[in-house]
Swiss-Prot record:
Plays an essential role in the initiation and regulation of chromosomal replication. ATP-DnaA binds to the origin of replication (oriC) to initiate formation of the DNA replication initiation complex once per cell cycle. Binds the DnaA box (a 9 base pair repeat at the origin) and separates the double-stranded (ds)DNA. Forms a right-handed helical filament on oriC DNA; dsDNA binds to the exterior of the filament while single-stranded (ss)DNA is stabiized in the filament's interior. Its main location: cytoplasm. One of its GO terms (cellular component) is cytoplasm. Belongs to the DnaA family. Residues 189-405 are annotated as: Domain III, AAA+ region. Keywords: ATP-binding, Cytoplasm, DNA replication, DNA-binding, Lipid-binding, Nucleotide-binding. This is Chromosomal replication initiator protein DnaA. Residues 1-71 are annotated as: Domain I, interacts with DnaA modulators. The gene is dnaA. GO terms for molecular function: ATP binding; ATP hydrolysis activity; DNA replication origin binding; lipid binding.
């Protein structure tokens, strides 16, 4: 029995992702084998794992048992809270002790950067105090404007009054390494909390994380620009901050800037108003790494787009890295100049999808641990099964549970969780699915639901299918590739064409607009 389980576990570990294996298979344990009845009993530590393993993995485990014993075997799954404690197969070598982990978190990140700066400071000669800085070096050194809401270099009062923009080092001696590390965070606008170490990885984001690590290791060389897109709360901002934090660790003094697209637009306007645009340009063109978040906010801002285009060209020409995020695929962003879209496409574009079940559980468990709370797996699975959209929603739900538990003086249980999330769970139960959209549209236009997946192209089928794709994009959080997959494995460009076509026709066709309104109200209940 134990030999079989060792064999079975090894095969499943190769077939599954690490997170799937650790979450579902590793906690299982064989507890009994009846050779006369050809039955094998496998224990799971809780009800959620038991139900999930039975529905997802029982067939594969049964097949492996039949192959191992060369006879049909009935695999039974039983509940045993102690299963996880004895899941290692008999005879297996004990795991080697892991080396202690280095401290993580913002304090550790700042400390590492400070040490890096101190090493560089001791090795490099100090520049004479009266040597003027070059414009590009000064632009990288100063980030604070005379007006607090625009990121341009500060000026001595007499120069500001004279309207001159002379660049020079800040007064006084160089700060200590720790102070310089803090100052670097202030200038770069990076959040030291957001690192690769505390980024939970799963199927939904593993490609994006791999690309981010590659860029952090080889900035300006691999994937320039890197364009990450996906819905809100899926970890795009976390990843780009992680890249910036990693580069600060690897390269003390790197010129890095994180900025939200809305702030960039605002700063462009203010730079023009204050006749400080040369300084603005000089600063952005001198960066080593530019992280710009939610670039869809550039939509319709032609002057901002023009200036960003020139900044982009200058940075890439200088082998500086550009990283961009958006809530949607680049070609789907309306109101963006074609020149910019082509530049976005010249690097690597990666989607971040909503987290799968195992990843949602891992996020909840890790977040609870960071709050000093020991969250049971039963509760984590319950929440993860009911809340599926994004990380922020999961973290918000966990905060509600913790607050409810503290206020009522009760331990966290599934019952308490249901009470704490009552309103949220009600909303989730009414959530619109692509499958429901397909059925509703098919009924409305009197076609078969199967026509939504078929390759048929008659107008009486193709048009309702395009309408269903449009509604799926408007009413769900699915990405274009996900929607395409749910419509018979179609390419995301087919979905994009349908969405744009129906959106354009809706603005011109009153009858179509009325039909869409009726469908939307039906779906929203």
């Amino acid at each position: 029995m134990n030999d079989f389980w060792q064999h079975c576990s090894a095969l499943l570990e190769r077939e599954l992702t690490p997170q799937q294996y650790v979450t579902w298979i590793k906690p299982l344990a064989p507890v009994a084998f009846d050779a006369s009845a050809n039955t094998l009993s496998i224990a799971a530590p809780n009800r959620f794992k038991l139900d999930w393993v039975k529905s997802q993995f029982s067939g594969r485990i049964t097949d492996l048992a039949r192959e191992f014993w060369n006879t049909p075997i009935e695999v039974q799954f039983v509940l045993d809270p102690k299963a996880g404690m004895r899941s290692a197969p008999a005879g297996a070598a004990p795991a080697a002790p892991r080396a202690p982990l280095a401290p993580t978190g913002p304090a550790a990140t700042v400390a590492a950067i400070a040490a890096n700066l101190a090493a560089n400071a001791s090795a490099a000669p100090t520049a004479p105090a009266d040597v003027p800085m070059t414009p590009s070096a000064a632009a990288a050194h100063h980030l604070n404007a005379d007006d607090a809401d625009i990121d341009l270099p500060s000026l001595p009062a007499h120069e500001a009054a004279a309207g001159r923009r002379t660049w020079r080092p800040g007064p006084g001696a160089a700060p200590a390494a720790g102070g310089e590390a803090d100052s670097m965070y202030e200038r770069s606008k990076l959040n030291p909390v957001l690192t690769f170490d505390n980024f939970v990885t799963g199927k939904a984001n593993q490609l994006a994380r791999a690309a981010a690590i590659q860029v952090a290791d080889n900035p300006g060389i691999s994937y320039n620009p890197l364009f990450l897109y996906g819905g809100v709360g899926l970890g795009k901002t976390h990843l780009i901050h992680a890249i910036g934090n990693q580069l600060l660790l690897d390269k003390a003094g790197a010129r890095i800037r994180y900025i939200h697209a809305e702030q960039y637009v605002s700063d462009v306007v203010k730079a023009y108003q204050r006749k400080a645009f040369d300084d603005f340009k000089r600063y952005y063109h001198s960066l080593d790494l530019l992280l710009i978040d939610d670039i869809q906010f550039f939509s319709g801002k032609s002057r901002t787009q023009e200036e960003f285009f020139y900044a982009f060209e200058a940075l890439v020409a200088n082998k500086a890295q550009v990283i961009i995020t958006s809530d949607t695929y680049p070609k789907e962003i309306s109101g963006i100049d074609d020149r910019l879209i082509s530049r976005f496409d010249s690097g690597l574009t990666v989607a971040i999808e909503p987290p799968e079940l195992e990843m949602r559980v891992a996020i909840l468990m890790r977040k609870a641990q960071s709050e000093g709370v020991n969250l049971s797996e039963d509760v984590a699975f319950f929440v993860a099964k009911h809340l599926r959209s994004n990380v922020r929603e999961l973290e918000g739900a966990l905060r509600k549970i913790l607050a409810y538990s503290k206020f009522h003086g009760r331990e966290i249980s599934i019952e308490l969780t249901k009470e704490a999330l009552k309103d949220l769970l009600t909303v989730q139960n009414r959530q619109i699915s692509v499958e429901n959209i397909q059925k509703t549209v098919a009924d409305f236009y009197n076609i078969k639901v199967a026509d939504m997946y078929s390759k048929k192209r008659p107008a009486n089928i193709a048009r309702p299918r395009q309408i269903a794709m449009y509604l799926a994009k408007e009413l769900t959080q699915k990405s274009l590739p996900e929607i395409g997959e749910l419509f018979g494995g179609r390419d995301h460009t087919t979905v994009l064409h349908a969405v744009r076509k129906i959106a354009d026709e809706r603005s011109k066709d009153a009858q179509l607009n009325h039909e869409l309104h009726v469908l939307e109200q039906t779906l929203k209940g």
